Curated annotation (Swiss-Prot):
Protein name: Matrix protein 1
Leftover remarks: B/Memphis/12/97 is an avirulent strain in mice.
Organism the protein comes from: Influenza B virus (strain B/Memphis/12/1997)
Subunit and partners: Homodimer and homomultimer. Interacts with NEP. Binds ribonucleocapsid by both interacting with genomic RNA and NP protein. May interact with HA and NA. Cannot bind NP without genomic RNA.
S-adenosyl-L-methionine recorded as keyword: no
Amino acid sequence: MSLFGDTIAYLLSLTEDGEGKAELAEKLHCWFGGKEFDLDSALEWIKNKRCLTDIQKALIGASICFLKPKDQERKRRFITEPLSGMGTTATKKKGLILAERKMRRCVSFHEAFEIAEGHESSALLYCLMVMYLNPGNYSMQVKLGTLCALCEKQASHSHRAHSRAARSSVPGVRREMQMVSAMNTAKTMNGMGKGEDVQKLAEELQSNIGVLRSLGASQKNGEGIAKDVMEVLKQSSMGNSALVKKYL
């Protein structure tokens, strides 16, 4: 995969699946695909995207600025504050040393990526802020390599947290993880589905999940009904709602 293709993949790995991620992917493919775009407008779009966390906005915003450093008229607080606000004085010092001593000698994406892999996330965040504030001191390949290494670490942390919740010893946590996953799927189907049957099924699923939450896990058949709804979502055709109607 190309340099820009790798960067898009790492940036998207940070975000939750859903309609917002699909919209972000389309934007990233346009920005990194060579189409001309206005940097300020792109940064405003990222800044106002509600489905992104502050760190995600900062990383995506920085990546866009790395593409067009000459068009960057002013530094953005929504980028600098999350990058500089994490970690301790010691980790920030490590990030500064990494940026000033090691990354300045790098020439390629993979070289920067491999060096960045050996440092903790808070140090990499500060390193990226130094690169963002001094864009002329580093090549685009080095800046994107450092950013992608950080994205991999962030995505790994998110995956472990999600897996921990899914395997929780508390039944209520596992149940709500299933419900949240099902609701996200239903909302995405409703928002992006073009056929009436798909949208109708999505609305039914959202309604049924709401009923399940009202029933609560203490109900005798609550867990069984929840599993049946999850089974409906796993159907490849997404068109079998008979199982849900049998209970609700």
